[in-house]
Structures are given as structure tokens and as C-alpha cells.
Amino acid sequence: MKLILTADVDNLGAPGDTVEVKDGYGRNYLLPRGLAIVASRGAQKQVEGIRRAQEARRVRDLDHANELKQAIEGLSAVSLSVKTAGTGKLFGSVTQSDVAAAIKAAGGPVIDKRSIELPKSHIKSTGKHTIAVHLHPDVTAKFDLQVDAAAS
């Protein structure tokens, strides 16, 4: 049975792939769960149209990610003031949300906190820390975040 996958199926393929499977697997598992559709000329043309649109969207997203990377790496100083103990240790920690707010406050673009990668799970000391922002699977921006003690 020839099918076109509509979802990612382990050990079989990705959405849009045309696969040949045994009749029982196709009829009893893939088709009822909506993981595949029966392959036909019309369905194949539709899949090709969807692939072209996805490729165009991927190129557009890559261009946008490169623009965001230039904007982030072009920021002169991204700093954050937090409460600290006398030894330079923070009360609490700096999270991805705090970093996203610091980027926006420094005049940078709005960044989703889930795309920010901290050097460790959280920043717990003052000083300069290198932060990575994953904007696209192929584009990562890096910048330095200065964490300072807040004036009490």
C-alpha cells in the first residue's frame, strides 16, 4: 500500500514522504490515526505545493533570523542589575525571562525566552556572561550580558 505521511512516524519517515507499507499496517494503524493519507496524483501534487511553501517560509525565516542576529550582536551593552549578597552571589538567579527583558531594555528585539541558552541552567553570580540565542536551527546569536549588583 502506497501512502503519504502527514506526521512524523518513527522508523518510517517525515511528513510529506511517500512510503510503501504493508496493507494491514496502513489500514489498521496509519490511516485511522491520521498519520497518513492514500497516495494519489492529487495528493502528491498537494504535498509538492506544501513543500514549496515550506521551503519559501524556511528561507524567509532564515533571512529574518539573520536580521535578528545582527540586531542582537550589534547591541553595545546589555546589562542587568540584581540584588546580591556582599560576596557577589545573587539572591535567587538570572533566568531566561530576565535576559529577554534585558535585551529589550537595551534596545534590542523582543526574543522568546525559550530560545535563550544560559551558560549553566541559571546565572548565580555577578560579572560578564556569554549568552547564546537560538533564532533558527542554522542561526545562533551570541552576546555578553553584564550582571551588576543593584544599589541598595
Curated annotation (Swiss-Prot):
Gene3D superfamilies in the record: Ribosomal protein L9, C-terminal domain, Ribosomal protein L9, N-terminal domain
InterPro entries: Ribosomal_bL9, Ribosomal_bL9/RNase_H1_N, Ribosomal_bL9_bac/chp, Ribosomal_bL9_C, Ribosomal_bL9_C_sf, Ribosomal_bL9_N, Ribosomal_bL9_N_sf
Species assigned in the record: Nocardia farcinica (strain IFM 10152)
One BP annotation, GO: translation
Function of the protein: Binds to the 23S rRNA.
Encoding gene, per UniProt annotation: rplI
Family listed: Belongs to the bacterial ribosomal protein bL9 family.
Protein name in the entry: Large ribosomal subunit protein bL9
Superkingdom of source: Bacteria
UniProt GO molecular function: rRNA binding; structural constituent of ribosome
Keywords: Ribonucleoprotein, Ribosomal protein, RNA-binding, rRNA-binding
